A protein has these predicted regions:
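Active-site and NAD+-binding cores of ADP-ribose-processing enzymes
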Residues: 1-23, 36-151
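GIY-YIG-like beta-to-alpha core
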Residues: 23-32
Length: 151
């Protein structure tokens, strides 16, 4: 599958700093999230590189996610069933009464990182998530800058 990432500037080096760590967001279509003319990259992935967020806890190695679920539960002050539901996208942060409305967007981004981390723990390169743009893919790009094709 061919996916696209747009950036406000040329990508020289990918690191694990920042909100989404080593994961970059990709879309099935070119999108713009910046006022400036974006730098557009494409990436080829196979279906076996990707797991859907909704399938994470159905994977045969889902028990490996126990620590990650506990970490999110503690961070958000929710039970582990709720944390799991957030990671697999069957529940939204907007459904959690203890999360203030003004914090919900930031928390939802934090949860997306946990979803990507879950996929990586299970041995996948990417996870398909749903966000305000529809289907999106969070792809582990650490050390893989050369795989980005400038469009």
């Amino acid at each position: 599958m061919k996916l696209f990432h747009t950036s406000p500037s040329k990508i020289e080096k990918i690191n694990s700093d920042g909100r989404f760590g080593e994961f970059l967001f990709f879309s099935g279509n070119v999108y713009t999230m910046t006022v400036a003319a974006p730098v557009v990259y494409s990436l080829e992935l196979t279906d076996s590189d990707v797991i859907k967020a909704s399938q994470l806890f159905y994977h045969e190695d889902a028990a490996k996610l126990t620590g990650l679920v506990a970490e999110l539960a503690e961070r958000l002050g929710v039970d582990e069933d709720t944390a799991e539901a957030l990671i697999e996208e069957s529940k939204s942060v907007y459904d959690i009464d203890s999360i203030e409305a003004e914090d919900a967007a930031d928390v939802s981004w934090d949860v997306q990182l946990f979803t990507a981390r879950a996929a990586k723990i299970l041995g996948f390169r990417a996870v398909q998530v749903t966000d305000e743009q529809g289907a999106a893919w969070m792809v582990d790009m650490l050390g893989r800058e050369s795989e980005l094709t400038l469009q």
